[in-house]
Amino acid sequence: MSITSIINNLIDIITLYIRIFYVIYYIAIKSKNQICIANILYTSIKFYYTDIIDAVLKRGIDPNIPFPLSENSYVNPLIYAIECDNHDAILSLIRYGADVNTYSNYLVITPLYISVLHGCPKCVEILLYYGANINIVTYKMVTPIELASRICYNNLAFMVCDRTITNIPKKITYNFEIMKILVSHFILQASNDRLNNRHNKYFSEGYNKNKMLVSTSIILTYFKKQCIEDIDIMKNIKLGDDSFLDILVERNTMKLSTYISNQDILDIPKTVKVYNTRINMLLDEAIIYNNINIIL
């Protein structure tokens, strides 16, 4: 190990301990709460201390541990990370086994629903990539796509009424991005027969509601057309017995890693309009998988 690596490791360790002391100080003195492992995890998420989050999760804490305060019974670490817009914490929690479809009370408020509600496109993208069910409905029978559509029309109505607005607010831009991500995932899921045959839960009341919305809403239909164009492109890219579309839907990083040296595969994100981010996430995973195999 080089001197530079030793120094960097030492700096990381010192930084970790300083942050741990500050988190404990914040919990005990500023917040006047009990010092426990759950509070340490939630406070670390709040302050974006990914090193503490990883250290706590490595020690075996439940990544779905409830929020310490009973009045926030719907909150778990994943939902809290979404409310803090902490993408690194979301990824760490998922890697250590956080349930992307979890909900802790009768409202059936899932992490995906919270991401849509808070207007976090990146959070929505991450959750869907790692298996969040787009067809789960709340106790009021609302799907994430329906929620995003309602927010969109409320925002547009507000813009029409308030004539002082000259630029499109960020929240409206984010909402459009979220709707595009949700529609793209729904269309991608529906395009793969093997996936649908394995998971009959997708054929539910939520699925039927989403299907109707995507087929009737003017805005959602526009996104749907873009998705279908991308899907046709990916269907025609063959990797052995499978198309690139099958590999993307099923997140088959093992198979994709065997083709990762092919520049045409690496250039696929440039040929599509909607699925760029998801394809790049899959390619990154395949590259990491390939590098690990080379080392081993």
Swiss-Prot record:
Keywords: ANK repeat, Repeat. The keyword Repeat applies. SUPFAM superfamilies: Ankyrin repeat (SSF48403). Coiled coil: none annotated. It holds the Pfam family Ank_2. It comes from the Viruses. ANK repeats lie at residues 73-102, 107-136. InterPro entries: Ankyrin_rpt, Ankyrin_rpt-contain_sf. This is Putative ankyrin repeat protein FPV216. It comes from Fowlpox virus (strain NVSL).
